[in-house]
A protein has these predicted regions:
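Acidic/histidine-enriched, glycine/proline-rich intrinsically disordered or flexible terminal extensions
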Residues: 223-238
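GST superfamily/GST-like fold recognition
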Residues: 168-193, 210
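Extended, well-ordered alpha-helical scaffold segments
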Residues: 146-150, 198-212
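Short helix-capping/linker segments at secondary-structure and domain boundaries
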Residues: 45-47, 140, 187-195
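Cysteine-centered motifs
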Residues: 2-3
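Structural helix-adjacent loops and short alpha-helical linkers that scaffold large soluble proteins
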Residues: 106-108, 194-198
């Protein structure tokens, strides 16, 4: 735990940078894809201009950068656009110092096949079941508990892994944990009473570890919605 806290506090040494030269990061605070990208950006100490958006009123600048209309979106100073959270995560690690990369090589994107498979399951089957569980009223022909049962197939896999190690792949935090955590958080809070009484005690403890962590609490700091004005420009890790 001490090593984990110390590693969060490490920050990349960089030369002074004008704020207008910073990468622009479009985010929505509660989006799980945006949360995992912000967590890694904060973990690495990568400086960005954060533009908090409302998904119901997406800014034209974001839509011009990425026609997908989803967050997160990262616009680099040279004009390159990254609009997939895992690509943004890999970019953030590329910006860190060599010392930080050595310390956190397990996080830098060179995933084992088992780690890659877990993230693919999370972003595919589990996310689909999660959406059905959370927004079941959109398709009422399938009851909510059926969506939850489908999602539980993934929870069961995670519970088994946590029976072997403190985190999903080992006794050390990995990119896999950060990539999956925001989605388990979203699932749990659909019906927190049910989740807290479910047969996943190890997953419950794993979730609480992240919810109480300095990394997550800093990541979830509230910022004003960006409207193009100087007052709504936010800068993190400067």
């Amino acid at each position: 735990m001490c090593c984990f806290i110390v590693s969060i506090l490490l920050r990349n040494v960089r030369t002074p940078m004008q704020v207008n030269d910073l990468p622009v990061f479009y985010s929505f605070r509660r989006c799980p894809y945006a949360i995992r990208a912000r967590m890694v950006i904060n973990y690495c100490g990568t400086a960005v201009e954060l533009r908090e958006v409302l998904l119901s009123n997406k800014p034209n600048a974001m839509l011009t950068a990425s026609s997908k209309g989803t967050v997160p979106v990262l616009v680099l100073p040279g004009g390159t656009v990254l609009d997939e959270s895992l690509d943004i995560i890999r970019w953030a690690f590329d910006q860190t110092s060599s010392d930080l990369n050595k310390l956190d090589i397990r996080l830098c994107g060179h995933l084992s096949q088992s780690g890659t498979n877990l993230i693919e399951l999370n972003d595919g089957m589990f996310k689909q079941a999660l959406d059905g569980y959370k927004y079941w009223q959109r398709s009422p022909e399938k009851p909510q508990h059926e969506h939850r049962s489908e999602a539980e197939q993934f929870l069961q896999q995670l519970e088994v892994l946590l029976g072997e190690n403190q985190f999903l792949l080992s006794d050390q935090l990995s990119l896999v944990d950060i990539a999956i955590f925001p989605f388990i958080r979203q699932f749990a809070f659909v019906d927190k009473d049910w989740f807290d009484q479910s047969c996943y005690p190890l997953l419950q403890n794993w979730l609480e570890h992240f919810l109480d962590s300095e990394l997550f609490l800093n990541t979830m700091a509230k910022y004003p919605v960006w409207n193009g004005s100087e007052e709504t420009r936010n800068f993190i890790n400067l």
